[in-house]
Amino acid sequence: MAVPRRKTSPSRRGMRRSADALKTPTYAEDKDSGELRRPHHLDLKTGMYKGRQVLKKKES
């Protein structure tokens, strides 16, 4: 069975766990509608992505 040669220091353990934290998602304001949306995602209400109509407009 494999056994570590040295004890992992608290500093190294913390550096390894630094990527485990949950980050809040970032939002960008849509230029056309002014709604908040995720960057690099299309707007589901208008169906636009990068100035092009990708989906049909959602009826409300």
Curated annotation (Swiss-Prot):
UniProt feature, compositional bias: Basic residues: 1-16
Gene Ontology biological process terms, A to Z: translation
Keywords: Ribonucleoprotein, Ribosomal protein
GO MF entries: structural constituent of ribosome
Residue numbers spanned by region Disordered: 1-60
Pfam families: Ribosomal_L32p
Transmembrane segments: none
Protein origin, superkingdom: Bacteria
UniProt-listed NCBIfam families: rpmF_bact
Protein name in the entry: Large ribosomal subunit protein bL32
Recorded name of the encoding gene: rpmF
